[in-house]
Amino acid sequence: MPEGRHIFPQMTVEENLEMGAFTDQADMARTMADVYERFPRLKERKRQLAGTLSGGEQQMLAVGRALMGKPKMILMDEPSMGLSPLLVKEIFAIIREVNKQGITILLVEQNAKMALAISDRAYVLETGTITLSGDAQELLNDARVKKAYLGQ
């Protein structure tokens, strides 16, 4: 899932979801029903142009489109970018739920506190080099991480 959502703004919500699916129509219908169950707001707006959705709804659409391909893993690049604090919490709850359903999430995120709070394992990069790695909860409590990335 690329940074900045990258939806197709002139297409409807439903058309955007179809872009992420395989071509088997029956399978696509089942997967779309699953996405709509996870994101009821998208179902309410399925005929609406994607470019008119709020930032949070566009992020939900980007996640939904990624899920349409029934992936084993999703790379998410800055999913909280440009969202209000309330929507950030909502998106991170969605990421956690997707992961609980067996999909591996590789999360690239500057909001270290939120990312560490929902992660199992974490890596800290500085100028492209891994400087720390380990259990996310341990890193969340690490004094070096707190000082450098969590403002504590």
Task: Report each predicted region and the residues it spans.
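A short, proline-enriched helix->beta-strand linker immediately N-terminal to the Walker B motif
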Residues: 68-72, 78
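Helical segment within the ABC ATPase nucleotide-binding domain
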Residues: 89-101
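Conserved ABC ATPase signature
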Residues: 49-53, 57
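ABC ATPase signature
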Residues: 11, 53, 66-67
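Short coil-to-helix segment of the ABC ATPase nucleotide-binding domain corresponding to the Q-loop/switch region
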Residues: 9-18
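Hydrophobic anchor residue at the start of the ABC signature
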Residues: 19, 63
